Amino acid sequence: MPRGGSEDQKVYVGNLPGDVREKEVEDIFHKYGRIKYVDIKSGRGPAFAFVEFEDHRDAEDAVRARDGYEFDGRRIRVEFTRGVGPRGPGGRPLQDGGDHRGGDFRGGRGGGRGGGPQRRTGYRVIVEGLPPTGSWQDLKDHMRDAGDVCYADVARDGTGVVEFTRYEDVKYAVRKLDDTKFRSHEGETAYIRVREDNSSGGGSGGGGRDRSRSRSPRAERRASPKYSPRRSRSRSRSRSRSRSRSASRSPSRSPSPQ
């Protein structure tokens, strides 16, 4: 896409409060440049918005400064709508996060900051049947219809992985986006299959049971040497003290009737 095109000037803003107002979104970004429009999408779960600036450089500044910004108790996500971002020599994006078709899921993106830590939840679906030109950003855009996407990646074989911020969105994605028409940024289309990744540890109401099971062995290992001997000694001491107290009280009770 030519430099300065509309996608270069447009940013996605995720994890907004469901009742956010246009003026509030404008207040977050107004100091970075003149805003052409704000389009808020709300419904199930957190709201999100698209903000278009008049100058692509203002959009770049907004992504750098506001991704991860805390608003109304939430950490919002700000990224380019097509992963365009600032470019270096030869027109290559400075934010590495394009289509990682090397065979493994090793470079998917969850936010707009290049190289930043990715927020992972385990609330994951597997997407199969993606066209060869489908990128992680194409997949992320498609799956946003089901909820707030925090991570997406695409492998060489046309399989994708997507993580949502809520488990309810996983169920909704399987129900509503399975066997839907997917379009890549190059216009290539395919019907995709979407299924829950039950091996991710994020299922069954949020994955709390899986994660608690994974923590419990470590907790037991930490607790056993520290507390078990102390508890056993303290119980033995308490029993011995109770016996000594009972022994000391028994003589005092015997002479009482006179």
Swiss-Prot record:
It comes from the Eukaryota. Predominantly coexpressed with spk-1 in adult hermaphrodite germlines. Residues 108-117 have a biased composition (Gly residues). Its main location: nucleus. Residues 81-120, 190-258 are annotated as: Disordered. Residues 97-107, 208-223 have a biased composition (Basic and acidic residues). Keywords: Developmental protein, mRNA processing, mRNA splicing, Nucleus, Phosphoprotein, Repeat, RNA-binding. Residues 9-83, 123-197 form the RRM domain. Residues 247-258 have a biased composition (Low complexity). GO terms for biological process: alternative mRNA splicing, via spliceosome; embryo development ending in birth or egg hatching; mRNA splice site recognition; RNA splicing. Interacts with spk-1. This is Probable splicing factor, arginine/serine-rich 3. It comes from Caenorhabditis elegans.
